Amino acid sequence: MTEAFKQQIEEEARQAVTELLAQAKLRKGDVFVVGCSSSEIVGGHIGKDSSLEAAQAVYAGIAPVLAQQGIWLAAQCCEHLNRAIIIEREAAEKYGWEEVCVVPRPHAGGSWATTCWKQFKDPIAVEEIRAHAGIDIGGTLIGMHLRRVAVPVRLSLSKIGEANILCARTRPKLIGGERAKYTEED
């Protein structure tokens, strides 16, 4: 992988997370899930061409932006680990998510989860979470880890590297019927 392509991936990842955060209106302590197929980023087929370099470039673009705002990064593993989540122990404890025993590797968990495991201060794996927003890079199906109700968010870019991206924020369910009010101004 060329240096120029790594820089492109990093910048696209940074831009995507920055744009999504601007629309999602997350608060300090919220959770942001990222599913990332490094294979798709480099133009391969999901699960077939894992690239630590691509995953590291995505991490370099996303992690500092989230850290600056005090938002927890949750890294979704691949299908071989049942799409488990790698997250900092402190975040999992805050939200009451139960730890499971597994350490991701590039071909069992994916390069993205492996990269995050190595970069996090005190990483653990959990089976499921309810994140406040997230980015799906390359068709990794993050929906199972989003809070209800997920709201699609369009960005100015539609790819990171060669991988398509889909983004979502979440909002509380609207309840109550015709007399209900949903804002203070109503």
Task: Please state what every model-predicted region is.
Residues 1-32, 52-65:
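N-terminal glycine-/serine-/threonine-rich phosphate-binding loop
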Residues 4, 29, 42, 67-70, ...:
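Non-catalytic beta/alpha edge segments that cap or flank active sites
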Residues 24-26, 108, 154-159:
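Solvent-exposed alpha-helices and their adjacent loops that cap or buttress functional pockets
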